[in-house]
Regions:
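Terminal and linker regions of secretory-pathway proteins
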Residues: 1-149
Length: 149
């Protein structure tokens, strides 16, 4: 896995604008991928950011009780701090099956795992807001383990 690439989004836009890729994912040939959208930004209701998501998760669990959910958080994230993730996850009231099990990668602490009924919460040690960018191996390990479970 490569080190953090600060301009990685430029590569994504170029890839998604490739005519072969657009054709493969059934996107109109005249559509153009852009990193940001003024139309989306103008339509965004900033008061939505303060709405709690717990009712959404309650509805998801009611409709699909056997669904497995993964939430991960970089423990060095200063935008969405890990404590905030913990607060809303614990407020869901799901049964805790396994608490704060350390996860190791190559003999080093990579984070901690808390398993709930239907939900796994992972911290990724040393990761910032963009876990795959700042700790790619640790993030990949979390995703691989979750998908294998």
């Amino acid at each position: 896995l490569k080190a953090y690439e600060p301009c990685a989004s430029d590569y994504g836009a170029a890839y998604l604008n490739d005519p072969k890729v657009r054709s493969a994912i059934h996107v109109a040939s005249n559509a153009t991928w852009g990193e940001c959208s003024d139309a989306v930004s103008a339509a965004y209701n900033f008061t939505d950011a303060a709405r709690p998501m717990m009712p959404v998760y309650d509805e998801i669990y009611a409709r699909a009780p056997h669904l497995k959910v993964l939430v991960y958080s970089g423990d060095d994230d200063s935008i969405c701090v890990t404590m905030g993730s913990q607060k809303w996850i614990w407020s869901l009231g799901r049964a805790v099956l396994d608490e704060w099990a350390p996860r190791l990668l190559d003999g080093q602490l990579a984070g901690y795992t808390v398993k709930f009924q239907g939900l796994t919460f992972e911290t990724i040690h040393g990761a910032g807001h963009m876990c795959p960018a700042t700790q790619p191996a640790r993030t990949f390990d979390v995703l691989r383990a979750f998908l294998a479970s």
